[in-house]
Amino acid sequence: MSAHTGASYEGIAGKYAATVDSKPWNAYYERPAMLALFPSLVNAKVLDVGCGSGWYAEYLLSHGATVTAIDLNGEFVALTQARVGQRATVLQADLTNPLDFAAGGEYDAVICPLVMHYLRDWQPAFREFQRVLKPNGVLVFSTHHPFADWQDYNTENYFAVDLVEDEWDVGKVRFYRRPLTVISRDLDATGFCIERLLEPQPTEDFRLVHPEGYERLTKSPGFLVVRARKK
């Protein structure tokens, strides 16, 4: 079985990037929760993992951070580079391999928005995040909520790690679902302590643009957002 499903974005990255800045699940649900868990960004050195089309990289820069942004998909790397120019270092990198561009203890924070569910095994990536973080550094990441995936994809065993496929407006995407206990276990095993865990609520702006989605997310979780600190 493949270690990651990031190749799912090949051929659809441009279509995805065209809508992701304003898509309510991102703009009015996932991002507000991520931002609420960010540490102070002024003069912070931050690694943006899975930079996509560059929204987070641009936000981090505008709030005083020095940014390295990485993505597996070459088209996303080009889109982020075009968006931020020379203000950030933008690289193509695979989370199933060591992050050889980064020195140990280089970053104050690692952010990883809606990326981890494309990996079958989280521990190698978490170990690299732990390595590149400074002592007491912070990891903030978002992922699919375990209950939502178990409910939506009719998998028989909640406690299993399963490969599932979804049909988006821009095409088919594959990812892995897993139970909450595996998420907690993998963080602890790689030297992280969970500080905060959010099951986000959609903002009022979400309700205005997508009432049906808003109604669902106020009653059933979609994403999980975690802030963990290097032990």
What is each residue range found by the language model?
Residues T190-F192, P211-K231:
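Core SAM-dependent methyltransferase catalytic element
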Residues Q123-V138:
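A short glycine-rich, Lys/Arg-flanked "PGG" loop and its adjoining helix->strand segment in the class I
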Residues D100-V110:
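A short acidic, Gly/Pro-enriched loop at the edge of an enzyme's catalytic core
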Residues A109-Q123:
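A short SAM/SAH-binding and catalytic strip from SAM-dependent methyltransferases
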